[in-house]
């Protein structure tokens, strides 16, 4: 079974990694789909984000990393996904994600959305929070994979020592 895990991943966090690792164990194959959204100004280019994810997931089998723009359901069909995977940190995530899941189901009736609750130790993480901490020189090595922490430190000229 193939799961499509879409997102901006700007940057990839340990919360994302937790979901990817659990999804591989549950579904066998995971396509991580990096959104190219022209309406946002990301910290990292799509190619950089793909590289970060490939580096962070190199220890896993069954991972593909692709980019997409447009509708998630089109990406899922293109990559022959059986389901769309979404992570939930809090009830506020659920309300938004449920609306999107219903919309996706209206566009592709055979495509299910599966929600995984984020592990408690990562429930506070978001890419926005990580960027904010890094922007002001705080340590992010406990929030993101090692390679991503290095990229963030370079991006924001941070010299904060690792925790």
Swiss-Prot record:
ATP binds at residues 8-9, 16, 87-89, 97, 122-128. It is found in: Cytoplasm. Transmembrane segments: none annotated. CDD domains: PPAT. Its EC number is 2.7.7.3. Its main location: cytoplasm. GO terms for molecular function: ATP binding; pantetheine-phosphate adenylyltransferase activity. Reversibly transfers an adenylyl group from ATP to 4'-phosphopantetheine, yielding dephospho-CoA (dPCoA) and pyrophosphate. Homohexamer. This is Phosphopantetheine adenylyltransferase. It comes from Parasynechococcus marenigrum (strain WH8102). The gene is coaD.
């Amino acid at each position: 079974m193939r799961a499509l895990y879409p997102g901006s991943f700007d940057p990839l966090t340990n919360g994302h990694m937790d979901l990817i690792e659990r999804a591989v164990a549950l579904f066998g194959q995971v396509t991580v789909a990096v959104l190219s959204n022209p309406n946002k100004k990301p910290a990292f280019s799509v190619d950089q984000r793909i590289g970060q994810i490939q580096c962070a997931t190199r220890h896993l089998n069954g991972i593909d990393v692709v980019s997409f723009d447009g509708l998630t359901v089109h990406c899922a069909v293109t990559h022959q996904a059986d389901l769309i995977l979404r992570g939930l940190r809090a009830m506020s995530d659920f309300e938004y994600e449920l609306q999107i899941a219903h919309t996706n189901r209206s566009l592709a009736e055979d495509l299910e959305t599966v929600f995984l609750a984020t592990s408690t130790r990562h429930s506070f993480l978001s890419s926005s929070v990580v960027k904010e901490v890094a922007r002001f020189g705080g340590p992010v090595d406990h929030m993101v994979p090692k390679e991503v922490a290095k990229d963030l430190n370079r991006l924001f000229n941070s010299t904060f020592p690792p925790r």
